[in-house]
């Protein structure tokens, strides 16, 4: 239901895209949503990339095809792991922050104050978060994808002394343009889910400050689960369309 609600709210926030004051608020949200999640997302990508290279390399070495680790890492992170790792990191860091912020505004009746002042709470509070997430999450996904691929290079550099130039030449040979479009679409969908779930959970806060803490926990759990479900659906659809086929 949160995903449908997110799609329903997009027309409501589109008129405010051109307003300078919203862009200023959106830049602040970029720092909160993207920059603050970068260390965790980058470390996760490096760790998972190295482990994936290590495990796949152990099997491929038996067939004398250790250099094929490049293809495994490049395709896995470009199509799947980069966007998913980023979304999970942003979900844990930002869904809770959004839920806590909005929930506190509800408890302290700031939302009602905005309505009394003649301001649309959705335009004032939700639009900057959407803009910040839709801009930042794809950029963060690109950085995490690079971190994961670079971890594969570190493994092969120590294993078979593969040079930086050779490694990344093979990376660009393995990656197709449709793989890039696939991860961009995924990152935009994931950003929408994370912001919408955090916002809705914050709006549902009732009672005292304890309710805000519960809402943040629920926001992280729901957003992470919905991101994984959306990833499965998107990957399945693109597979049926032939976008995930080799060649």
Predicted regions and their residues:
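Short, membrane-interfacial amphipathic segments enriched in basic
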Residues: 1-25, 201-206
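Selective transmembrane-helix segments that form parts of the transport pathway or gating/packing helices
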Residues: 34, 38, 42, 81, ...
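Hydrophobic core segments of alpha-helical transmembrane domains in multi-pass membrane transport
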Residues: 48-49, 190-199, 227-235
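Membrane-interfacial helix-loop-helix connectors in multipass membrane proteins
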Residues: 54-79, 145-188, 192, 196-218, ...
